[in-house]
């Protein structure tokens, strides 16, 4: 395992642990999700470059498109919750409350 793979996997693991630990605020959850997507993008890109796989060359671009859509939806949800409740706690997103 090369040092690059180790660093990317460490970034992925730290982002995932951050997503599990800091679930109280929506902004910190969104930042951890962006870290996950960025490390996954780097890992997929490096893997495709090393294996010279031309069939999967569009996969990093598709991953970036999904990451951008996820970021836009997350930020719009953050703005909507902040305008409605005045704070960005994840507990305000419970759909079972009336």
From Swiss-Prot:
GO MF, any single term? NADH dehydrogenase (ubiquinone) activity
Q: Where in the cell is it found?
A: Mitochondrion inner membrane
Q: What class of enzyme is it?
A: translocase
| Transmembrane feature ranges | 1-21, 30-50, 61-81
This protein's major location comes to mitochondrion
Any single GO CC term annotated in Swiss-Prot or TrEMBL for this entry: respiratory chain complex I
Q: Which reaction does it catalyse?
A: a ubiquinone + NADH + 5 H(+)(in) = a ubiquinol + NAD(+) + 4 H(+)(out)
EC number of the protein: 7.1.1.2
Looking at the keywords, is Transmembrane present?
yes
For the biological process aspect of GO, one term held by this record is: ATP synthesis coupled electron transport
Identify the keywords attached in UniProt to this record, alphabetized. Answer: Electron transport, Membrane, Mitochondrion, Mitochondrion inner membrane, NAD, Respiratory chain, Translocase, Transmembrane, Transmembrane helix, Transport, Ubiquinone
Q: Can you state the subunit structure given in the record?
A: Core subunit of respiratory chain NADH dehydrogenase (Complex I) which is composed of 45 different subunits.
> Per the similarity annotation, which family is this?
Belongs to the complex I subunit 4L family.
Q: Which PANTHER family match?
A: NADH-UBIQUINONE OXIDOREDUCTASE CHAIN 4L, NADH-UBIQUINONE OXIDOREDUCTASE SUBUNIT ND4L
Q: What is this protein called?
A: NADH-ubiquinone oxidoreductase chain 4L
Native organism:
Pipistrellus abramus (Japanese pipistrelle)
């Amino acid at each position: 395992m090369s040092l690059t793979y180790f660093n990317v996997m460490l970034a992925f693991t730290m982002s995932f642990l951050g997503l599990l630990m800091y679930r109280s605020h929506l902004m910190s959850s969104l930042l951890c999700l962006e870290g996950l997507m960025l490390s996954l993008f780097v890992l997929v890109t490096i893997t495709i470059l090393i294996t010279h796989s031309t069939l999967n060359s569009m996969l990093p671009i598709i991953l970036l498109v999904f990451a951008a859509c996820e970021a836009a939806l997350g930020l719009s949800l953050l703005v909507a919750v902040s305008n409605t409740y005045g704070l960005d706690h994840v507990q305000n997103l419970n759909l079972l409350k009336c």
